[in-house]
């Protein structure tokens, strides 16, 4: 290993995975991510308690790679008493949050095209569900454990008790369920700029990464995260609104602002 993860981290070496690996991140969930020295592979390792979640991510990557949507491919899978390790082919390029506003504006049409292709995958063929009720159940669990990350919340909500934030949203569930039933697509589940990889020269989309939350859901669950996250790159609100309009035109559907708001406020309550 050319770099070292934190103490107690599960590493590729524990599973006999060959090669020289560099530690990239260690997530709060206990997951550790490593990049091969030649940048062709990634390894994600978790302790045994989190192996089922990583196995679910493996299955989603394997399924999506057969749907004509660019992304990683599963190369190896290891599981044992120490935990589990998923090795995938790297998606070449640079995450879209690491390019400036000018480059993101150039890439924006390609991003809209790629998201549309993902959402056009026949939803009946998708074996994974990320329905609204299951997402709300996850939020209830996170809130009950007091595990909501305040920094994930909009600034204006950070002093509001998470239970109150969730109660505001659950009052809308009947309407949102009906909308989901009428507009379910294959969603990425965490469609923010770091999970969209761009070719550094052409600025075309090389692929989607971090697919652990992929599943059938209301398309607005994806669009809310993407459009809000892109606002961190656009230099002002006028350009952000122009980008939103350009995305809608290229994507082919004008998003519903109220559904965008709902999913944008629900998502931060599901991480913890």
From Swiss-Prot:
The active site is at 190 (proton acceptor). InterPro entries: AGP_Transferase (IPR051678), Aminoglycoside_PTrfase (IPR002575), Kan/Strep_kinase (IPR024165), Kinase-like_dom_sf (IPR011009). It is an enzyme of class 2 (transferase). It catalyses: streptomycin + ATP = streptomycin 3''-phosphate + ADP + H(+). It comes from the Bacteria. GO terms for biological process: response to antibiotic. GO terms for molecular function: ATP binding; streptomycin 3''-kinase activity. Its EC number is 2.7.1.87. Keywords: Antibiotic resistance, ATP-binding, Kinase, Nucleotide-binding, Transferase. Belongs to the aminoglycoside phosphotransferase family. PANTHER family: 3'-PHOSPHOTRANSFERASE, PUTATIVE-RELATED (PTHR21310:SF41), AMINOGLYCOSIDE PHOSPHOTRANSFERASE-RELATED-RELATED (PTHR21310). The aminoglycoside phosphotransferases achieve inactivation of their antibiotic substrates by phosphorylation. This is Streptomycin 3''-kinase.
